[in-house]
């Protein structure tokens, strides 16, 4: 398989302990997503040899780089106070747990498929803000945020599903995010 595209970074409010999602939205346009799982490891040595080895998931580091960070993200993800065209930051604001998904296009044996991923419990933190003058060439500055994904009490931390069409992948992300049809 070869991944050839990335789109639709989806965020949804996570309500615990029911672990349900609501109010999904597209968090800008995806530029890059990095997911790096972290593991706890242990070895048992007996009779002068390695007798056992275990490795289990702890959490995953996530970096999300998008074209923009919508105002809605500041409220749902970071706990800031928002209005239609403004964000107010307070020292007491706390990041909230969310569900996070996205879709990638891939080619498998020459056939295009769409893979959607959903991470069940993620807490993002705001990144460094950087601004530059325009200068002779146009250089885009885009927001990048980091976070950690962790497992739910039942051990699930991520789902991945492959679809024949992009529309099916997007519908699955919307469903995972708790979108209801009106």
Residue positions per predicted region:
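Short amphipathic beta-strand/extended segments with alternating polar/hydrophobic composition
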Residues: 22-26, 114-121, 159-163
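Solvent-exposed edge beta-strands and adjacent loop segments
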Residues: 1-76, 123-139
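Structured, beta-strand-rich domain cores
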Residues: 52-118
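Short secondary-structure transition/capping segments
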Residues: 9-11, 110-112, 145-149
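Repeat-unit-sized solenoid/scaffold elements
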Residues: 3, 77-80, 91-105, 132-143, ...
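Mixed-charge, glycine-accented linear interaction segment located at domain edges/termini
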Residues: 122-182
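Hydrophobic transmembrane signal anchors and adjacent membrane-proximal interface regions, especially
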Residues: 4, 9-12, 51, 89, ...
């Amino acid at each position: 398989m070869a991944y050839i595209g990335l789109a639709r970074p989806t965020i949804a409010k996570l309500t615990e302990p029911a672990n349900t999602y609501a109010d999904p939205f597209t968090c800008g346009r995806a530029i890059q997503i990095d997911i790096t799982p972290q593991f706890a490891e242990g070895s048992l040595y007996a009779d002068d040899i390695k007798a056992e080895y275990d490795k289990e998931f702890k959490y995953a580091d996530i970096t999300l780089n998008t074209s923009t960070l919508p105002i809605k993200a500041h409220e749902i993800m970071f706990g800031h106070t928002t209005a239609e065209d403004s964000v107010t930051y307070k020292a007491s604001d706390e990041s909230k747990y969310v569900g996070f998904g996205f879709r990638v296009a891939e080619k498998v044996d020459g056939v295009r498929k769409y893979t959607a991923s959903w991470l069940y419990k993620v807490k993002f933190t705001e990144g460094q803000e950087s601004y530059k003058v325009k200068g002779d060439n146009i250089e885009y500055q885009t927001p990048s945020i980091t976070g950690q994904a962790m497992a739910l009490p039942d051990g699930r931390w991520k789902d991945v599903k492959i679809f024949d069409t992009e529309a099916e992948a997007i519908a699955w992300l919307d469903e995972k995010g708790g979108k209801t049809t009106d």
